[in-house]
Amino acid sequence: MWFRNWADIIIISKCPEKLSLEQKENFLKSIKAHAKQDVFFSTLQIGNPRKVKGNLSIDKRPFKKIIALSGIANPDSFKEICMRISQNCVSLSYKDHHHYTANDMTQILSKLDDDTIVFTTEKDAVKLSAEGIYNLIPMNQFYVLPVQVQFLFEDESRFDALIKEKLLT
């Protein structure tokens, strides 16, 4: 594997949240990292949904469907995260760096009814805001779903210390 001779640190991303020590050890054997390489495992964690406009948290009203709206490189990951909240999830995905248009909003609005909410990424919320399009979706139905990287096996402090060490040497 190409990284064996180049990387000081290897991060295995998007692991299952409940990765077992046995699975970790098997993966470490399979990648054959050098002893001098530090290997970390991470997963994606869902933050608390908040309204696109303002920092208000999600309304407690019931909803039956989620629209997962994204213009990112790997929309399947975002849809999977949305499906953790509701199995009734429709994905409206666009290419990475997509510039949203009025036609896109027409498509979104055609799928929106009273018991549907829209989740989008933090990146897309910024783009939709800049393009002035996000005002077309009712604010009580439009939320940012923050996704954060979380290190597994309580390795975050070890990772932070290693980065500081690498920067200072």
Question: For each predicted feature, which ranges?
Answer:
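G-domain G4 guanine-recognition motif of GTPases
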Residues: 10-22, 42-49, 69-74, 95-99, ...
